[in-house]
């Protein structure tokens, strides 16, 4: 194998073996992913975000994956932004005043990458950084004849990484130590997305999206309880004076059972009445849910009219918002 040189023309040692298979890293990588969004509260969310600011990315990473999985609106809006990159044309161009060899190399690389079956998946996996702030993919090397090639690109769980405690802008691979281990040269593709200015653990959209997610889901839960109370007719069983405890229990079972089935039986001399459902308005809950979804759309796409027309959603406004989305 020929020597590999850096951008300054200096050779360096290169290990083609995958770094994640070395040392104690496989034990770190075998962790179970937590689901911190279950029953999430503002205080618990703040703890996850503060941990990431200090270099511990695990809780925030799991939180980001959890809200993307649980919120269909967030998933759809994020998917629009992630998939948009697939349609952007690209090419490998030689540098200015390139030599004949440089032009030939650029042409060869362009042809190779356009034909690589892993390239589109790698682009999509890189956009995981939009939500989490970073996405790390490990390179699997191989040989094709005498040519050194990339055989595959393996996405790695974002919880497998940490920040260098001496430089919170530097991502490192977790190995069980306090500071982690630096990425080996030519072993990784690392994309760090900046939705806001900050260090490595504070640039992902998850830090903005978690708040409308929490308040929206409070209202979704409250709406479900509201519909359970106000959306069904009240069932009232009446028993005659002197009914035995066994008869009362039989009537109660009939009242509860008939709510799940279309028929039932009750003891003779007893009656079952259906009363109109209690009056109530779901508008406050729906308003809060709508606010949460609009806030999510604004944070991800820069607007809302590419998702829903709204009360005054004119076509021209929708086109303006679509241009904003494309620019993002």
Predicted features along the sequence, with ranges:
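Active-site acidic/histidine clusters and adjacent loop/turn architecture
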Residues: 82, 90-93
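Intrinsically disordered or highly flexible coil/loop and linker segments, enriched in small
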Residues: 88, 118, 225, 229-232, ...
């Amino acid at each position: 194998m020929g020597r590999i040189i850096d951008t300054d023309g200096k050779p360096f040692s290169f290990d083609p073996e995958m770094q994640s298979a070395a040392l104690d890293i496989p034990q770190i990588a075998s962790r179970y992913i937590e689901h911190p969004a279950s029953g999430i509260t503002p205080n618990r969310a703040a703890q996850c975000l503060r941990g990431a600011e200090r270099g511990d990315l695990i809780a925030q990473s799991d939180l980001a994956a959890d809200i993307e999985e649980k919120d269909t609106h967030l998933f759809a809006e994020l998917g629009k932004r992630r998939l948009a990159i697939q349609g952007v044309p690209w090419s490998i161009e030689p540098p200015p005043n390139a030599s004949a060899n440089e032009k030939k190399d650029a042409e060869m690389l362009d042809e190779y990458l356009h034909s690589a079956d892993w390239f589109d998946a790698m682009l999509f996996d890189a956009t995981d950084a939009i939500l989490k702030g970073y996405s790390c993919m490990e390179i699997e090397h191989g040989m094709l004849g005498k040519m050194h090639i990339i055989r595959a690109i393996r996405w790695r769980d974002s919880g497998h990484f940490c920040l260098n405690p001496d430089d919170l802008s530097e991502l490192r691979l977790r190995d069980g130590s306090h500071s982690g281990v630096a990425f080996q040269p030519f072993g990784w593709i690392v994309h760090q997305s900046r939705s806001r200015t900050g260090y490595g653990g504070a640039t992902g959209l998850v830090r903005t999206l978690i708040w409308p997610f929490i308040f929206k889901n409070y209202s979704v839960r409250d709406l479900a309880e509201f519909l359970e109370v106000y959306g069904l007719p009240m069932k009232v069983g009446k028993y005659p004076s002197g009914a035995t405890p066994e008869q009362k229990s039989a009537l109660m079972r009939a009242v509860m059972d008939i709510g799940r089935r279309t028929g039932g039986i009750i003891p003779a001399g007893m009656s079952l009445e259906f009363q109109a459902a209690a009056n109530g308005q779901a508008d406050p809950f729906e308003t809060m849910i709508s606010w949460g979804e609009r806030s999510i759309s604004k944070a991800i796409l820069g607007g809302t009219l590419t998702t829903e027309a709204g009360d005054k959603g004119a076509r021209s406004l929708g086109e303006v918002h679509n241009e904003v989305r494309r620019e993002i």
